[in-house]
């Protein structure tokens, strides 16, 4: 494996902070050999040396269990441990000479962020890598909100959520190494590349060009490209990359001279050494420049740049100022620019041209060779010019199109000063003496302007690709804002403080980036594979309690002179009551937890709050990290608690424990983050998180954040951590490296080609032995990376234990996993790529495009929420001067929707809330934040004041004035989560299995429990699905697996009885294919009754809550014990009694008894992360999966893991799983597990064909479309049913006699007409309207309204009518039309939403009618049409254009059937005006009203410019004017 040269050898690798002088080499060499000589098996755990308390003495490593510190001076003379391993094993290599670089000075970064100078940096630290014997739990990690059953709860998760007990934090520091790269090899490879510059315009040449040159241009340089070292092959930090040469060699005199100055790093390097495992080595001498071409270009632009034979040595380039000046023009370090083939990329030279097959043929060369003597040279030259011009024109067109797309991608919804957003259009790599590797990125901005960005150490180690988005946060130390490096300004000696963020539109949490420091692979796997199995953790629960106790205590102290222990105990008791259930499921007593908090935290919190939460900093001495100094710092105010900040500038997000105002020396106030930790461990990830919080605050408030405060509740004092430029750079490097694994979430993947799923390399460290995701990591290593025991780094035999089960069918397993993992990734790209729209579109643009946003808002009123303590209702209205604003009802935001509130200056997610009400002029949002805008800018004084959200003293009038210093936007919170749960479900097929019933002891709680099959991999499903093992059934002559007897008076038909018998004889699984209306729910309820009567436990699950509840409603009159998991407001009122109430649970045994005695547990497929599934003593005997044909295979695998046998019920002739990505759909993701098993093993299927829903005519349609006459009516009564009209004569009163049209409404409502296609081809006024992706048809909406009005006036109840459409824009229009009390009970849904439901009468609006006869793509899916038709019981009315709908080939024969049966009713020209119903016009007007007259403004007409792109409003105005 790249970067993992060791084989089962371990060393105690070290991370050191720079400090003092270089000393003798021999000592550390001997120590390294001693370490290497140790055996792999460790007899004693390593102890953790104290931090910030180490002296730089010459201390050798002893064999004691505690590894003592080694002086930094000794460590500096060592090479990396893995190089020593090679040296020892081969006994041929010598350690490289060390190098000490001159000390750098630190400078402030930019207006966005100020960084502290060297005096606040740490002194000397030596930290040993170790593997703790017991799990070392962090006190604060972020739980995944995705797939949470209650979406509301995940909108504002705590920064200290409960984390599964088995997930443990392992402190480890990476020390990854790759073999040295041979620079000569790079030069040789580049020399083989034929590359030429292409001019911007091709004109007649003065002389004949070589035909090879022309062919090369035509073919697009189809030569072998030099390879760029993959990032996975690089070390964990750029500092230690051995294949890239370092700065100039330092001679002995310079070393002696610099001994007194220490290392060159700026400020605090304790974090940097952990991030980078820093080392220095002697650089090879180099006299030539190596230029690498880009090999990673995805599309469009590609630059060709080659090496001239006459390339001159640039060893003389030493002047950094000269280098910087050259870089500004994009021509830095080019060889002999007048004569070199490597020239600067022109605007039109960045597209890769793939020639056709004929251009690749040699026939053109042969032809030219044969005719060369017969044709005049100028004729050949003219012909060649024509070819070149043709190619050039094609290139220019393609390039312009690509560049336009890139420029669009580079636009930002809210540009910021000092932040530049660019898209890479081409790139190249250059090897320079005394500089090392340099990459030159040709970029384009949102205005279409191109520029060059020069990237050096450390940013050069990122794998840039064409099309990547970068943010440059401009600093102030270097004049060239397009140079990203560690170089110093030669005049001021200040370090380059420009920062780079790669793929900034993916936001990573501070916790994720912090954990990546120890192991990048582990962090990536946790994010991409969400394991729903978790165990309760007392440590996490305790951390939550202590966090909230400290936060409450701080808030109390702000308004009181002192806090007493009595107050703390009072607050603690309240918190213990809140967390009582969490404590109980940890098998602990509440009193014990209280004593623990009082013993280990309460006294410290009391001392800390009384001493440090004070207006004055007198006596509040705070230690400064990395130094022996202290500084008076107090917390004079608290700005916010649990502040949630999203930063699309830095590509980061996080919850801050507290944002505080710190009073430092000379009463200078600073806004800084206060990070609270409650555990015993001291992890470098805490420092990473804290520094990330400084960046987040810098983005939110646009002020310098110079440090952060860290407080451990087990201590009485806090520590100040200065914000250091070098540390910030490497934290962003870690974040940027993570982003490369999630690029698919930014752009939708369209191609069907399978992409490679790459992971960071194995850490191969001692911490791997106790890693909580070791099984997943090694299985993936085997499936994706052809892993071997030697490369795993695990103790001997362990890799085989974890992966040997894959050997029996490894090739098939690899193919299966790779295929479906790729399909999940493609689908994930389509789901998540829309997330960035929130950041990249300004509010008005997003509102006009999609309606998912309301823009230009101001606060009109703020009131406290009457029902929810600590909540407020913010009322928003449009700006007063905005006369052109649309009605808020025109948006897609509705009551009870979750929304995100941001300001229009680029500060996103100020808070999240739920819509309380919305009307044309106002919208009310319930939030838990008192102030939205607490940033007050005095432009005259140039001072920014930050108001406290916790203790705001503003009056109502001042509050609103303060809030309206900015304008707001409200976005519908449809941020899509990744498919990490589905990806883990797929992986679980290949994890090692666990034998059930084995006694195991939990290492933390010491409790003994028996294993369950669900604790390991899903071996049974793997054999059935991947190995294609056929399911087994008991023979009809044998007794069934589950003995049963049906009652004599049962109403079940023969089909249903056969289906039940199939289930009871199944040894693995059974499938029930239930056609529409055939009683699937009844059969499932009967099966549950039989299984429970035989003592079996059942897990009932489906994709939707309604499907689960429909089955439970049929069981409500039984004595079966049922537990319905889910939030009450999502559960049907009739089944809410089954939602568990744990108030009666007083102990851990009470809880176990309650869940283990429950016969039926019901939940959705995505609700399987409940703690019940972990604490269950046994898995379920049966899992019943309803709606199985609508669930994609990876999602269905989740609940099936928890049962010994399973039953799937569905109909794959109805709606398939919803798949957004076309490539994923065509690749097979749309094929459900139900359909797969139906087709592979039809003997496992029981069909239900007798239906009791639809009349005979409607069944005819369904049989014609799908079922080939298999579907039958259950009895004659069902066959002959019709829609009854109690008062049909009422319609005559509403006829418009002036209209010549016949009384079409009475005709189509005639009860004998059970299927009607209402064809309006003769009505010219009815035509579709298309606005971007929104397709509506107002004429059809009016016809639908008249049909509903006609039925209501004829006596048909609203509850018996359903309105359906296939288009969501039409759905919104219909809902607005019927938004009146008189239509209560009328359901208006899409075909997908109507699945599983039925009505006596269904009206379908087909929408499409246009002159092009384009019927659209939705009708091509016959399964969707089938669902639409089969929702009706006794009457089906289809409103559409026969000519347009009939143009769809897939549906043409269906239209012909309607004509043959005389079911098409063609309307007359003026049919729209035949009836006039009461309040009809008012309903339409209110639904469509998008604007009204404004006082003092010119009236808007249908010819106004304002409505030119608003066809709905334009049509309304035309109706008014007519």
UniProtKB/Swiss-Prot annotation:
EC number(s) given by UniProt: 3.1.-.-, 3.6.4.12
Chain residue ranges for the region called Nuclease activity: 450-900
Organism domain of life: Eukaryota
Catalytic activity entry: ATP + H2O = ADP + phosphate + H(+)
Known cofactor(s): [4Fe-4S] cluster
Homology family: Belongs to the DNA2/NAM7 helicase family.
Name of the protein in question: DNA replication ATP-dependent helicase/nuclease DNA2
Protein species of origin: Saccharomyces cerevisiae (strain ATCC 204508 / S288c)
């Amino acid at each position: 494996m790249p970067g993992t040269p060791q084989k089962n050898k371990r060393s105690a690798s070290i991370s050191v902070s720079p400090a003092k002088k270089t000393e003798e080499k021999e000592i550390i060499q001997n120590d390294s050999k001693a370490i290497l000589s140790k055996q792999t098996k460790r007899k004693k755990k390593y102890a953790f040396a104290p931090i910030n308390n180490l002296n730089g003495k010459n201390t050798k490593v002893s064999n004691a269990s505690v590894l003592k510190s080694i002086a930094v001076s000794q460590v500096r003379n060592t090479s990396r441990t893995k190089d020593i391993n090679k040296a020892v094993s081969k006994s041929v290599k010598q350690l490289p000479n060390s190098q000490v670089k001159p000390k750098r000075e630190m400078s402030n970064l930019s207006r966005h962020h100020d960084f502290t100078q060297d005096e606040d940096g740490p002194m000397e630290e030596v930290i040993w890598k170790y593997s703790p014997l017991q799990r070392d739990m962090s006190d604060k990690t972020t739980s995944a909100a995705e797939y949470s059953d209650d979406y509301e709860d995940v909108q504002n998760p705590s920064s200290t959520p409960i984390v599964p007990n088995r997930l443990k934090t392992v402190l480890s520091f990476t020390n990854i190494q790759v073999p040295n790269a041979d620079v000569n090899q790079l030069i040789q490879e580049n020399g083989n590349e034929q590359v030429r510059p292409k001019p911007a315009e091709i004109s007649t040449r003065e002389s004949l060009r070589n035909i090879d040159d022309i062919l090369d241009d035509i073919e697009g340089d189809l030569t072998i490209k030099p390879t760029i070292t993959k990032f996975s092959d690089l070390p964990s930090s750029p500092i230690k990359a051995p294949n890239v040469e370092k700065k100039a060699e330092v001679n002995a005199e310079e070393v002696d001279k610099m001994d007194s100055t220490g290392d060159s790093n700026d400020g605090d390097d304790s974090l940097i050494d952990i991030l980078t495992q820093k080392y220095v080595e002697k650089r090879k001498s180099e006299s030539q420049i190596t230029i690498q071409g880009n090999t990673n270009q995805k599309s469009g632009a590609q630059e060709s740049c080659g090496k001239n034979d006459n390339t001159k040595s640039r060893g003389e380039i030493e002047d950094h100022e000269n280098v910087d000046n050259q870089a500004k023009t994009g021509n830095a370090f080019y060889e002999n620019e007048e004569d070199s083939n490597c020239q600067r990329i022109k605007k039109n030279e960045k597209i890769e041209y793939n020639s056709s097959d004929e251009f690749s043929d040699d026939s053109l060369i042969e032809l030219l060779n044969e005719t060369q003597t017969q044709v005049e040279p100028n004729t050949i030259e003219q012909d060649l010019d024509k070819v070149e011009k043709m190619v050039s024109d094609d290139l220019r067109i393609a390039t312009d199109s690509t560049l336009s797309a890139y420029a669009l991608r580079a636009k930002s919804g809210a540009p910021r000063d000092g932040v530049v957003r660019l898209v890479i259009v081409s790139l190249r790599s250059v090897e320079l003496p005394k500089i090392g590797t340099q990459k030159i990125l040709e970029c384009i901005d949102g205005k279409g302007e191109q520029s060059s960005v020069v990237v050096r150490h450390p940013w050069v180690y990122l794998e840039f690709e064409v099309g990547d988005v970068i943010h440059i946060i401009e600093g102030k130390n270097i004049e060239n804002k397009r140079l990203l490096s560690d170089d110093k300004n030669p005049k001021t000696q200040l370090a380059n403080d420009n920062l780079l963020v790669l793929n900034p539109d993916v936001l990573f949490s501070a916790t994720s980036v912090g954990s990546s420091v120890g192991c990048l692979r582990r962090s990536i796997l946790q994010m991409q594979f969400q394991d729903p199995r978790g165990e309760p953790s007392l440590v996490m629960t305790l951390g939550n309690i202590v966090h909230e106790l400290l936060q409450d205590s701080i808030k109390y102290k702000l308004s009181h002179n002192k806090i007493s222990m009595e107050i703390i105990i009072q607050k603690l008791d309240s918190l213990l009551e809140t967390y009582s259930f969490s404590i109980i499921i940890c098998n602990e007593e509440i009193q014990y937890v209280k004593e623990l908090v009082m013993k280990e935290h309460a006294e410290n919190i009391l001392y800390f709050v009384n001493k440090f939460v004070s207006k004055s900093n007198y006596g509040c001495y705070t230690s400064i990290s990395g130094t022996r100094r202290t500084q008076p710092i107090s917390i004079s105010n608290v700005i916010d608690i649990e502040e949630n900040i999203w930063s699309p500038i830095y590509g980061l997000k996080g919850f801050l424990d507290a944002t505080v105002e710190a009073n430092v020396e000379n009463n200078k106030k600073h806004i800084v983050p206060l990070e609270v930790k409650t555990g015993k461990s001291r992890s470098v990830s805490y420092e990473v998180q804290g520094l990330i919080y400084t960046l987040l605050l810098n983005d939110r408030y646009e002020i310098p954040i110079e440090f952060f405060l860290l407080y451990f509740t087990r201590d009485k004092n806090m520590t100040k951590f200065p914000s250091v430029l070098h540390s910030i750079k490497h934290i962003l490097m870690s974040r940027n490296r993570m982003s490369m694994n999630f690029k698919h979430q930014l752009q939708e993947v369209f191609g069907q080609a399978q992409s490679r799923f790459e992971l960071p390399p194995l850490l191969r460290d001692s911490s791997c032995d106790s890693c909580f995701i070791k099984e997943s990591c090694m299985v993936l290593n085997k499936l994706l990376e052809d892993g071997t025991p030697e490369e795993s780094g695990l103790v001997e035999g362990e890799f085989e234990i974890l992966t040997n089960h894959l050997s029996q069918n490894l090739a098939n397993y690899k193919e299966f996993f790779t295929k479906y993992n790729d399909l999940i990734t493609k689908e994930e790209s389509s789901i998540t790529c829309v997330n960035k729209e929130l950041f990249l579109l300004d509010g008005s643009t997003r509102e006009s495009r999609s309606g998912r946003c309301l823009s230009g808002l101001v606060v009109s009123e703020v009131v406290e929420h009457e029902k929810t303590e600590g909540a407020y209702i913010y009322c928003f209205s449009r700006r007063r001067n905005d006369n052109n604003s649309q009605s808020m009802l025109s948006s897609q935001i509705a009551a009870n929707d979750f929304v995100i509130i941001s300001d229009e200056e680029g500060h996103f997610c100020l808070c999240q809330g739920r819509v309380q009400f919305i009307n044309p002029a106002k919208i009310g949002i319930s939030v838990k934040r008192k102030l939205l805008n607490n940033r007050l800018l005095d432009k005259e004084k140039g001072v920014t004041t930050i108001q406290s959200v916790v203790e705001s003293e503003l009056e109502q009038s001042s509050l609103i004035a303060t809030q309206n210093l900015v304008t707001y936007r409200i976005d519908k919170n449809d941020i899509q989560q990744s498919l990490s749960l589905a990806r883990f479900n797929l992986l679980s097929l290949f994890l090692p299995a666990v034998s059930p019933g084995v006694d195991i002891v939990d290492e933390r709680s010491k409790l003994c429990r028996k294993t369950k099959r669900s604790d390991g991999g899903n071996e049974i499903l793997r054999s059935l699905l991947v190995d294609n093992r056929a399911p087994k059934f008991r023979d009809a002559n044998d007794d069934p697996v589950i003995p049963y007897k049906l009652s004599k008076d049962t109403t079940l038909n023969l089909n249903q009885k056969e289906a039940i018998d199939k289930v009871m004889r199944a040894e693995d699984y059974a499938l029930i294919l239930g056609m529409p209306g055939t009683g699937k729910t009844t059969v499932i309820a009967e099966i549950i009754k039989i299984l429970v009567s035989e003592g079996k436990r059942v897990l009932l699950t489906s994709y939707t809550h309604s499907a689960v509840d429909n089955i439970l409603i049929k069981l409500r009159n039984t004595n079966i014990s049922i537990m319905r998991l889910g939030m009450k407001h999502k559960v049907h009122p009739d089944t809410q009694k089954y939602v568990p109430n744990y108030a009666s649970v007083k102990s851990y045994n009470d809880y176990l008894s309650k869940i283990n005695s429950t016969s039926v547990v019901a939940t959705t497929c995505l609700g399987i992360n409940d703690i019940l599934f972990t604490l269950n003593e046994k898995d379920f005997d049966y899992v019943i999966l309803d709606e199985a044909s609508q669930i994609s295979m990876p999602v269905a695998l989740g609940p099936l893991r928890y049962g010994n046998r399973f039953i799937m019920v569905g109909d794959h002739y109805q709606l398939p799983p919803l798949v957004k990505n076309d490539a994923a759909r065509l690749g097979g993701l749309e094929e459900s597990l139900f359909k797969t098993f139906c087709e592979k093993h039809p003997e496992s299927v029981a069909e239900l064909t007798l239906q009791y829903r639809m009349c005979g005519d409607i069944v005819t349609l369904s049989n014609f479309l799908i079922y080939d006459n298999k579907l039958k009516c259950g009895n004659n009564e069902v066959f002959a049913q019709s829609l009854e009209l109690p008062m049909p004569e009422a319609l005559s009163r509403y006829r418009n006699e002036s209209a010549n049209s016949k009384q079409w409404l009475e005709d189509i409502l005639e009860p004998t007409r059970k299927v009607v296609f209402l064809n309006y081809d003769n009505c010219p006024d009815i035509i579709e309207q298309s606005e971007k992706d929104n397709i509506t048809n107002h004429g059809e909406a009016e016809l639908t309204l008249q049909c509903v009005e006609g039925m209501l006036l004829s006596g048909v109840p609203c509850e018996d009518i359903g309105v359906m459409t296939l288009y969501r824009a039409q759905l919104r229009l219909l809902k607005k039309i019927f938004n009146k009390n008189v239509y209560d009970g009328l359901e208006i849904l899409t075909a997908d939403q109507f699945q599983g439901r039925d009505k006596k009468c269904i009206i379908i609006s087909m929408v499409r009618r246009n002159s092009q006869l384009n019927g659209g793509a939705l009708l091509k899916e016959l399964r969707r049409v089938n669902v639409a038709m089969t929702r009706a019981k006794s009457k089906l009315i289809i409103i559409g254009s026969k000519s347009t709908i009939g143009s769809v080939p897939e549906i043409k024969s269906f239209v012909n059937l309607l004509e043959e049966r005389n079911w098409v009713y063609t309307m007359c020209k003026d049919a729209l005006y035949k009836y006039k119903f009461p309040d009809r016009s008012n309903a339409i007007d209110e639904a469509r009203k998008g604007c009204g007259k404004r006082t003092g403004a010119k009236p808007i007409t249908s010819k106004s410019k304002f409505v030119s792109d608003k066809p709905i409003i334009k049509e309304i105005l035309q109706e008014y004017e007519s």
